Amino acid sequence: MDVNRKRMVRMASAQRSEMLVRLSGKAKRWTVGGGGEVETHTFHTFCAGQKSYKSVVRRQRPRIARRDSRPSHPIANRGMNMLVHDLGFSHRACDRCHGQKLRCRRENNSDTCVRCARAGVRCTPRPMRLRSRAQSTKNTQQQQSQSPANGGSTQQLHVNQEQGPNDTNDEHSDHFEYLPTSLLDMPTDLNMGMDPSSLQVDIHPALTAPYGPEGSVHTSQPSGPQAPSHLRTAEQAGQTRWSDAPNLDTSDELYDFSLPATMRSSFPATYHRHRASLARNMSPQPAHQQGRDDMMVDFDQAEGNPRGSDGKDSRADSGYGNELSPSDLLRSPYGDAPDSDSELQPRGNSQDQGEQSNSILDTRHQNMTSWIRRLSDTNVQLHQHMQSIPLVGTGKKTRGSGAGTSLSPMELPVDSTFKLSSQYTGLLTSICARLQACRSCNDSQALAQLALDQPSQLLVLSSYMCLLASYDRILQHIEAWLKVRLKMGVRGSAMTLDDDESSSCFPTQLPSLAVGSFEVPKTSSIQSLVLTCIMETNVMHMHSLISEIMRPVSHPATGSASKTAASGPPAAEKRPGNGAADAGDGLSTVAKVTLQAIEANEDSTLRLVHTVSRLALQRVML
């Protein structure tokens, strides 16, 4: 056994051969040098160029350096030419061995490893290890001790400084294999957050403050030492980035965003009116300013119009936003008139009465503006409707004339004509009711404000002329339809005609007429009689309303006009001939000429109504 052992030691010292030793079933790499002794194990040795053999070595203790101990000198025996790894020194693998995931073997850290020497390439050693956390903390504390104090009480960090930098490296070098940092293969210049202030510069101080036992945040005392002047700590970064945030101590108009979300006051509902700047939009209003905003809008319950604190209307008289609803236009004509019983009561304060009268006048002025706007819209609709009614022709030529309308060309739009007439008549009735109320109370001031000026009067007359033209065209179609019926009644019944012959004889048809569940047949002449009666009644009613509106303010109220305006449409009788003449007294030249032209159109339309009525009666009597 001694001979074999000596032979093994001599072979390892001379050739530096590598042996693969299987200890307890686990394969490990060992290099046996001269004078070294191995524990008692059974192992197989493979030598270069020689046969393998089995041998058993029994010794009490090995003389080779163990992994858990380190010799006092890098090389225990100068005579023994052993590798550094066998002596227990920790070193980093070179770039080539590390990239191939192989073991890097070298005699010392400055020499070339065995694999690079065999391959004939340059061996680039890697750094020993990363800087330890204890060394980083100690260096940071030394830098912080040199920086000036920022003020306030600070807590000192207790760092163990018993070991120097070399001792620290030596301490970790013994157990380098078992440290988690040994698994990381990173250069030393890549500092992954060893400096506490490097990763917290962008964090608000309220988020980095320590929490108390009950979850409260203690921000009065910093938890760590102050950073040096050339480094930005979390507190300095927070002061720099949040220094522009408005504070309530500096200005009452700015908002304090440094407060928690639960301490921020909600924005008032009326704050959207103030848009002076972005800072004012983001800041709460003072109490006195919010009080002024609440007083800006005050609704008058009697009239439903928004008023200011002084009692005057805060709205402008222009634009479509001030349009009154139909219920306001059709209100009681005595809504603005003072009560007769109130005149017998003693007068109150003259200032209150003046404010009340001013508010009433403003309301009347707004009503007049709304009337003019509605008259303009109605005038446009009436003009378009007049152009949509086809002219009377022969055969099927009338179909092309009504191609631009939304209704069928075979059916006259009588229903749309009556709808627009009702809309126009309702608007004139509202104006006449206000005028009649002012005349009955002898309120000349209110009457002067409600009286229409010359452009408004021409607008009323223009709409009336469009209606008369529409009635005239419809009556011409009914007349032609009745004449054809009369001729067919002599030759035979109209029910015997087929569709082609009926369409050629009647290029236009009248709409259906129904009373509840009863519907009048389209071939009946009763339908023509009813339509002519409605047209005549509408013309008479509109004539009386226009005469009331066109009457000057100083003209006394005539009995016929006032009764017509108050009681509604008159009976179907002959139109009074002096109504328009009386209405023309005191008017301008343009209004007088327009009224004279309208009288001629009225006479022509009424004559046509009477002609159609006689034809319808003849058709009924057949």
Swiss-Prot record:
Biased composition (Polar residues): 148-167, 217-226, 347-360
One cellular component (GO) term of this entry: nucleus
Sections of the chain in a coiled coil: none
GO terms for biological process, alphabetical: fumagillin biosynthetic process; positive regulation of fumagillin biosynthetic process; positive regulation of pseurotin A biosynthetic process; pseurotin A biosynthetic process
Keyword match Metal-binding: yes
Keywords: DNA-binding, Metal-binding, Nucleus, Transcription, Transcription regulation, Zinc
Upregulation: Expression is under the control of the developmental and secondary metabolism regulators laeA and veA.
DNA-binding interval(s): 94-123
Compartments in which it is found: Nucleus
Composition skew (Low complexity), residue ranges: 556-571
GO MF terms held by the record: DNA binding; DNA-binding transcription factor activity, RNA polymerase II-specific; zinc ion binding
Signal sequence, renumbered to the chain: none
Spans annotated as Disordered: 127-175, 206-248, 299-360, 556-585
Biotechnology: Fumagillin and its derivatives have been intensely studied for their potential use in the treatment of amebiasis, microsporidiosis and rheumatoid arthritis. They have also interesting antiangiogenic properties by the irreversible inhibition of human type 2 methionine aminopeptidase (METAP2).
Null allele phenotype: Results in silencing of the fumagillin gene cluster and elimination of fumagillin biosynthesis.
Function as written in the Swiss-Prot or TrEMBL entry: Transcription factor that regulates the expression of the gene clusters that mediate the biosynthesis of pseurotin and fumagillin.
Name of the molecule in the record: C6 finger transcription factor fumR
Gene behind the chain: fumR
